[in-house]
Each structure stands twice: as C-alpha cells, then as structure tokens.
Design a protein with these regions (language model features):
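N-terminal secretory signal peptides that target proteins for export/translocation
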Residues: 1-4
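Bacterial N-terminal signal peptides
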Residues: 6-17
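N-terminal (or domain-start) structured segment
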Residues: 22-115, 153-155, 161, 177-204, ...
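An extracytoplasmic/periplasmic, membrane-proximal ligand-sensing/linker region
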Residues: 28-30, 175-178, 215, 238-241, ...
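Hinge/capping helix and adjacent helix->loop/strand transition within the periplasmic-binding protein
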Residues: 81-86, 94, 102-190, 239, ...
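A ligand-binding cleft/hinge motif common to bilobed small-molecule-binding domains
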Residues: 97-105, 166, 171-175, 202-236
C-alpha cells in the first residue's frame, strides 16, 4: 500500500515538473513567428527586422509564417489556438486585436485580452495629418479654426471604413469638436493620390509612403499623431502639443504568445526583444522605415494593449464607424 502511494506521489511530482522542465530547456528547436501580413509587404519587412537579433539572443532560428487575410484575423486565430509552449510567437498590429473587436458584428474566434500574452511593444509607426497645399491652414490650430468655421465643408480620406487611419480621423473630430466628412477609399495609395491632386483635402497617413510628396511640396504635414515628435520629421510638432492634448493615433507592432505560455519564456523573449530593439543599428533601421523603436516591458505592453482596446471602443461607439 505504502509502495503504491509512493509511486503515485512520484508520478504526480513528475507531471507537475514537466512544464517547468520544458520551459527550462526552451528553446531546443526553431521558433515559429506568425505574421498577419503578406510576405514582402512593408509591415512584413518591419516585423522581420527583429528576427536576426532574437535568433542570436535565443540561440534558435525564427521562422516566419505569413498568414494574411481577414484583416489579420486568420493569423491571430492560428496564434491564439497554438500550443502555449514558446514555439509559436505572434507579431501583430492593432487591426485584428484592438480595432476589429469593436467593429465586427459577429464575434471573433478569439478574445484579445484572454487568448494572448503580451510580450513587448516593438515599435510604433505614427500617422501624420497631411493636407493639400491649397488648404489655407499652416498648422493644427488653424485647421481646427477653419473646420469650425466651415462645418461639413472639409473632407478627409482613408484607406477604407474601419481602418486605423479612418479611426484616427474620427478621433481627431471627437477631440476637436469639428465636423469633417470622411471619404473612404479602397486602399491608402488612392487616397494619397487624391490629396496630392487636390481632389481630397486631407488624411492621416504613415510617413514613409509620402516622404517624396513632402519633400516635393505636394503635401503639407501639419502634425505628428504620436505623443513624441518623429525622428523622420523632427521639426513637425505633434498634434498633442498643437492644441489637442493627449491626441495619439499610431500603428504599432507588438509581440505576443498564446495565453498560458510559461512566464519564464515570456520574460526571456521580452529581454531578447528589448536588447535587440535598443541596439543603435536596429533603431536606425526602424526609423528608416518610418517606425519609432520601443522595446517595452511585459507590464507596459499589457497596459498599452488595454488602453488601445478602450480607446478604439470609444471611437467606434461615438462615431458609429462600420467596416465594409
């Protein structure tokens, strides 16, 4: 009897020790990183910047697994349902995780706060508010005054209903008390073309695709939509410092793991991300792609995701934004 009890006790201890032992040995094989974007696209290139550094820090190869489609939902679902063993990581932007939950009529096949373990905010890509040179406003304060004097007369373009730069415009309207008409396009390039051509008056857009237009004077940038000025446009003030305190509308890339991934693994990946992102040569590469490198702690990124969820919930509710 005593012998049997001893055997069962040892078996129980072995079972309890298995996850800890696995985490201790991790990683002993390549790590899959799911990306919800097409291979070769700018977001894909930006996300992959951290791969060499992470491989060096962790001692294993990182293998990209591009699962584009559904606005990022396909990749997010695969990541959420993967084994929480540290061999599947997920790099995401806000669309699938903090925006779509508030726009979809049907429930998503995952819960952002329940099914993912935030690891680190890798980078943010601030939007800029750009206008056609014919718009008689040289700064954000003048634009707000113009919009209030002519309610419903100004318009702004976006890449489509419910996308990040559409909601950036809605946030601007809410925080400034202005009435600016939204015009959705099928993709940002078409909207940019119309702003350059004077057919659309303004829009929020990422910096890198419009650098040539800025230098040529075909568009004028009135403000940066992050809380800090951009290294790419250091002389352009933030919207927050231009009369709209707290205004922030950014794209971002963050690393996640499936929920219940051992904390020791989460912490090791976080340390590797932070060390990689903080390297001077890596920072220069991010800035060259129009992204500001961050490398946050687990706790900071967890709080960031919650704030982003709350922000977009409010924007969508007040604006009545819908997706196509």
């Amino acid at each position: 009897m005593h012998a049997m009890l001893r055997i069962w006790s040892l078996l129980g201890l072995a079972l309890l020790a298995t996850p800890a032992a696995a985490a201790e040995a991790w990683p002993d094989k390549p790590i899959r990183v799911i990306l919800s974007v097409p291979a070769g696209a700018t977001p894909d290139v930006t996300a992959r910047l951290v791969f060499p550094g992470l491989s060096q820090q962790l001692g294993q190869q990182l293998v990209a697994d591009n699962r584009a489609g559904g606005g990022g939902v396909i990749g997010a679902e695969i990541a959420a349902k993967s084994a929480p063993d540290g061999y599947t990581l997920f790099i995401s932007s806000p669309g699938a995780l903090t925006i779509l939950p508030h726009l979809r009529k049907d429930p998503l096949p995952y819960d952002t706060l329940r099914d993912f373990a935030p690891i680190s905010l890798i980078s943010i890509g601030p939007f800029v508010l750009m206008v056609h040179p014919g718009v008689p406003a040289k700064n954000i304060r003048e634009l707000i005054a113009l919009a209030k004097a002519q309610p419903g007369k100004l318009n702004y373009g976006s890449a489509g209903n419910g996308v990040a730069n559409h909601l950036a415009g809605e946030l601007f309207k809410q925080m400034t008390g202005t009435n600016i008409v939204h015009v959705p396009y099928k993709g940002a390039p078409q909207a940019v073309t119309d702003v350059v051509g004077g057919h659309m008056q303004m829009m929020f857009n990422s910096i890198s695709p419009i650098v040539g237009h800025i230098k040529a004077g075909r568009v004028r940038v009135l403000g940066i939509a992050s809380l800090q000025r951009s290294p790419q446009l250091p002389d352009v003030p933030t919207i927050a410092e231009s009369g709209v305190p707290g205004f922030e509308a950014v794209n971002w890339f963050g690393m996640f793991a499936p929920a219940k991934t051992p904390k020791t693994i989460i912490n090791r990946v976080n340390a590797a991300v932070v060390k990689t992102v903080k390297a001077p040569d890596m920072q220069a590469q991010f800035i060259g792609l129009g992204a500001d490198p961050v490398g946050s702690s687990v706790e900071e990124f967890t709080a960031f995701v919650r704030r982003d969820m709350e922000k977009y919930a409010k924007i969508v509710k007040l604006s009545g934004a819908k997706i196509d």
